[in-house]
Regions:
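Short, low-complexity, disordered segments immediately C-terminal to signal peptides
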Residues: 22-50
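C-terminal motif of bacterial Sec signal peptides marking the signal peptidase cleavage site
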Residues: 17-20
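Non-catalytic cap/lid and distal C-terminal segments of serine-dependent acyl enzymes
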Residues: 36-40, 46, 55, 61-381
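Positively charged n-region of N-terminal signal peptides that target proteins for export
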Residues: 1-10
């Protein structure tokens, strides 16, 4: 009988131990559950929104700091990851979609702002989402994209057999982002002078082309949220405008933040840092972040709203300079909160358009008050 009692005692201990373990969440599963929940929640509306984060390796941390003005005005403030790894693009998205948007060329008048200021003609390329022509008076959010060194207008739509355009088509088709207009622009005049120094001079001057010519030409032609192409109406519609770029296009994106925060709310700098002060090999990181912070504070951007999705590949040739700025910005959490700044990396990503495609795939659902969809929630074709 004693042996039977011993056996029963051992079994009882095993059962109790199993129940205790079952009651404790697995840390990895808990992190995944927390992040997935963040992806499924809607962002808050207006200037006090906190965009939902893409899936990251770590769970959201509790915010113990004093709430910002945007947080105190919001009914619900999400706790989201501020850093992590981006999610790979669904493999089939690089192939043509059933419902495909169209790309059209638009020629507009400008000036050679990096040169003698002479009048010139430039061409940009515009992606119109599927159904644009039949959508009546529907207005669309708009994203401007800038290429890197040696790049050209339209390259985002044509590189890799149109893989980036295909991703846009699929994301819109499956309800992961709202239909939007996308512009693939250039800081070059005609592409004849593409040495590095001239390229940097051109991107530094691009904001004048953007403000005075490109933006009015595009938004005076296509139906965006700007009531007209007037400067006042373009400023009034900043909540519906985004700007992103890769490599020197990332540098351009930071310049756009510095000059054109009155016109643009969402920013996507990919593989690059701010060169408002300094330049390549002279990365004045603290001085540039100090300046960005002063723009935020002096222009009430915390209340008005802005969001930066900063990204780089883990094997990118410009990772060091990008990380320097990210670390400096993340070290100022009272200014650059997760509602305003996030930094994500592509695992194994190098300096190419595959990384760009992944960053767009991760960032765009966070722009323009887009509702987040999981793959299961996306409408079927």
């Amino acid at each position: 009988m004693r042996g039977v009692y011993w056996v029963l005692a051992v079994v009882l201990l095993l059962v109790l131990g199993f129940c205790a373990c079952a009651g404790k969440p697995n840390p990895r599963e808990q992190a995944q559950s927390t992040t997935q929940a963040a992806r499924q929640e809607s962002v808050t509306s207006g200037a006090d929104e906190a965009p939902a984060a893409t899936q990251a390796e770590q769970p959201a941390e509790e915010d113990s700091t004093e709430p910002t003005p945007a947080e105190t005005e919001a009914d619900v403030q999400q706790s989201i990851p501020q850093t992590g790894m981006s999610v790979p693009v669904t493999q089939t998205y690089t192939q043509p979609a059933e419902h495909s948007g169209q790309v059209v060329a638009l020629t507009y008048e400008s000036r050679d702002y990096a040169g003698d200021g002479e009048e010139i003609e430039k061409t940009t390329y515009v992606y119109l989402p599927y159904g644009y022509e039949e959508s009546g008076d529907t207005r669309y959010d708009i994203l401007y994209l800038m290429h890197g060194w040696y790049g050209s207008a339209g390259e985002y739509f044509f590189i890799g057999n149109g893989m980036i355009k295909n991703v846009l088509d699929h994301m819109i088709e499956n309800g992961e982002i709202k239909p939007m207009i996308v512009v693939s622009a250039s800081f070059y005049h005609d592409g004849s002078d593409t040495d590095f120094g001239s390229s940097v001079a051109a991107l530094r001057a691009f904001h004048s082309d953007f403000e005075n010519h490109l933006m009015p030409a595009v938004e005076g032609t296509y139906r965006t949220y700007a009531a007209s192409a007037s400067d006042a109406d373009l400023r009034a519609s900043r909540d519906h405008r985004a700007f992103g770029g890769f490599s020197l296009g990332s540098v351009t994106t930071w310049m756009q933040f510095c000059y054109d925060y009155d016109y643009i709310r969402y920013f996507l700098p990919m593989s690059g840092s701010c060169w408002y002060y300094g330049g390549f090999g002279d990365f004045r990181t603290k001085q540039n972040v100090d300046f960005i912070q002063s723009l935020v504070e002096d222009n009430d951007l915390d209340r008005r709203g802005y969001f930066i999705y900063h990204a780089v590949g883990t094997r990118d040739s410009v990772k060091e300079q990008t990380l320097l700025q990210a670390e400096e910005m993340l070290a100022r959490p009272e200014i650059f909160t997760p509602a305003h700044y996030v930094f994500f990396q592509k695992e194994g990503g190098v300096h190419d358009h595959n990384a760009v495609m992944e960053f767009l795939y991760n960032a765009l659902p966070l722009f323009f008050d887009s509702k987040e969809f999981t793959k299961q929630e996306a409408p079927k074709k």
